[in-house]
């Protein structure tokens, strides 16, 4: 299934049905009074979050959605049926914006939330409403209300507790596959991950969700590489796990490249709690590991955790630390 996280769609509520002009007809009664019924209300447009969905692909190829119109009123004071509301399911994490993106209408953060974005049009009045002492046989009725229509922008931000960040080929996808049952595409070349991957980490009787996004490169916040499109998917997380390729010749430069892109993208990411991991330590000597840890500690003033996603060394410690951080944030 394609991962789609941005779409533009057209929505319209159902129009109200027209009121009816009718007069009572009955044997032996020459001039029955007005008995035109009211039109039915048009259907509304409602969005609903659904935890079974994780992409907006359903709105990629079909872009126009209209609720059902209300029926016209009938004789014998019978009202027209109301139109069916249109319910559109979206993944948790979906945000509904105006077409230009300047107005946020709603943000779905839990399952089964509903938001009525357009109300159906009111039904028109039948001629029975207009009978008076001076007009016993009115032919007046009103038309149903025309419902609102609009183009809107849907944007999906995945919900996760932990976000994995790092340069391409830092080992994020391997880390995700080791700690979860997720099966991301993994290979030894940059940009293996082309879409965000989610996995659930189980620690004893507790769990949390972790997200791996495509690797960041310099200029990602401006659209370079793939990362800028997907950085939004880690804005909601509680903690970042920053993986650094231990086999790199300049681990400090690698760290600073990613860190700068996070800070330039948004204050949300800039202020996230960060756990820094020196990965691929299985290909380094103890002396090389310590040397690179010392350089990173000096540059970041933070604790550096040596790990290997190939041998699993140090990985469990990071998982437990992430869980503890998440619990402290809630």
Swiss-Prot record:
GTP binds at residues 166-173, 191-195, 212-215, 279-282, 308-310. Its cofactor is Mg(2+). Transmembrane segments: none annotated. It comes from the Bacteria. An essential GTPase which binds GTP, GDP and possibly (p)ppGpp with moderate affinity, with high nucleotide exchange rates and a fairly low GTP hydrolysis rate. Plays a role in control of the cell cycle, stress response, ribosome biogenesis and in those bacteria that undergo differentiation, in morphogenesis control. Monomer. SUPFAM superfamilies: Obg GTP-binding protein N-terminal domain, P-loop containing nucleoside triphosphate hydrolases. It is found in: Cytoplasm. It comes from Rickettsia conorii (strain ATCC VR-613 / Malish 7). The gene is obg. InterPro entries: G_OBG (IPR031167), GTP-bd (IPR006073), GTP-bd_Obg/CgtA (IPR014100), GTP1-OBG_CS (IPR006074), GTP1_OBG_dom (IPR006169), GTP1_OBG_dom_sf (IPR036726), OBG_GTPase (IPR045086), P-loop_NTPase (IPR027417). GO terms for molecular function: GTP binding; GTPase activity; magnesium ion binding. Its EC number is 3.6.5.-. One of its GO terms (biological process) is ribosome biogenesis. Mg(2+) binds at residues 173, 193. This is GTPase Obg. The lineage of its organism: Bacteria, Pseudomonadati, Pseudomonadota, Alphaproteobacteria, Rickettsiales. Residues 1-159 form the Obg domain. Residues 160-327 form the OBG-type G domain. One of its GO terms (cellular component) is cytoplasm. The keyword Cytoplasm applies. Belongs to the TRAFAC class OBG-HflX-like GTPase superfamily. OBG GTPase family. It holds the Pfam family GTP1_OBG. Keywords: Cytoplasm, GTP-binding, Hydrolase, Magnesium, Metal-binding, Nucleotide-binding.
């Amino acid at each position: 299934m394609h991962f789609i996280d941005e779409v533009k769609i057209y929505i319209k509520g159902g129009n109200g049905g027209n009121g009816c002009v009718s007069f009572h007809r009955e044997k032996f009664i020459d001039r029955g009074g007005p008995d035109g019924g009211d039109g039915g209300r048009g259907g509304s447009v409602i969005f609903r979050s659904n935890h079974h969905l994780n992409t907006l692909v359903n709105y990629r190829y079909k872009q126009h959605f209209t609720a059902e119109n209300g029926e016209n009123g009938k004789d014998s004071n019978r009202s027209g049926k109301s139109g069916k509301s249109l319910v559109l399911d979206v993944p948790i994490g979906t945000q509904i914006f105006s077409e230009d993106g300047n107005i946020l209408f709603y943000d779905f953060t839990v399952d089964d939330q509903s938001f009525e974005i357009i109300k159906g049009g009111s039904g028109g009045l039948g001629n029975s409403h207009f009978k008076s002492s001076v007009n016993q046989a009115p032919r007046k009725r009103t038309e149903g209300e025309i419902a609102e229509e609009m183009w809107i922008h849907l944007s999906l931000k995945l919900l996760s507790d932990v976000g994995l960040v790092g340069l391409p080929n830092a080992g994020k996808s391997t880390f995700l596959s080791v700690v979860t049952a997720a099966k991301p595409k993994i290979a030894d070349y940059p940009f293996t991950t082309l879409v965000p991957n989610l996995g659930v980490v189980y620690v004893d009787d507790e769990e949390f969700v972790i997200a791996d996004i495509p690797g960041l490169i310099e200029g990602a916040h401006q659209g370079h590489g793939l990362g800028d499109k997907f950085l939004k998917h880690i804005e909601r997380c509680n903690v970042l796990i920053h993986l650094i390729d231990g086999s790199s010749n300049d681990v400090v430069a690698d760290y600073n490249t990613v860190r700068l892109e996070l800070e330039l993208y948004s204050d949300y990411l800039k202020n996230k709690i960060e756990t820094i991991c020196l990965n691929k330590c299985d290909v380094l000597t103890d002396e090389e590991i310590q040397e690179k840890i010392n350089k990173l500690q000096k540059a970041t003033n933070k604790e550096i955790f040596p790990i290997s996603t190939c041998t699993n060394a140090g990985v469990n410690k990071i998982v437990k630390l992430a869980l503890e951080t998440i619990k402290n944030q809630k």
